[in-house]
Amino acid sequence: MGQWHQVAVVVVLRQVDQQHPLAFAQVLLHDRLTPLAAPELLARHAPLATPADLLALPLLRTPLQPWAPWLRAAGLAEAPEPDDGPRFVDLGLTLAAALRGQGVALARLSLARHELAEGRLVQPFALTVPAERHYGLVCHRPSPAAEAFAGWLQAHCRAVEAENSSAGG
């Protein structure tokens, strides 16, 4: 990210945790994670009856979202973090690979909501887990304009969270 606070940047949107070190950081979206796959990928494999069946499919990996929390929540505490298969450093690339049928992505509902609504991705299991990091607004020097923008953006993000909750979150 560099020295953005030394230039004329008012706000930055990025992934943050609850204890962000800057003076003004607000979590905008408490996202949820769930496995998502292209219908074509699932049609090429045996039906997924239980979450354990996912382990037979290629699991798309990213260091930004480890599979272990979802696997534990699904009752697969003994399943190791996948260490083979495609690995991506960008959440958008991971989602794009899932859309191409390259594997199952552990995806943020906020990023995939349109693909889910259009049926281009499916959620094989209703289980979701909270994301460990959240989208947030960071401002080095708070200002009335930054706070007004944050309020407007938070209202939009609350609507997305409500949509995610009704879609299986």
Regions from the PLM with identified roles:
Residues 1-88:
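Acidic, Gly/Pro-rich loop/turn segments at junctions of secondary structure
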Residues 8, 77, 120-123, 139-140:
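Short low-complexity, flexible loop/linker segments enriched in glycine and/or proline
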Residues 40, 69, 73, 96, ...:
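Residue-level signal for well-ordered alpha-helical scaffold segments within enzymatic catalytic domains
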Residues 79-124, 128-131:
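Hydrophobic hinge/microswitch elements
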Residues 64-68, 94, 146:
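A general structural signal for well-ordered alpha-helical segments in protein cores
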Residues 4-6, 54, 96-101, 116, ...:
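Hydrophobic residues within well-ordered alpha-helices
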Residues 109-118, 127-169:
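C-terminal effector-binding regulatory domain of bacterial HTH transcription factors
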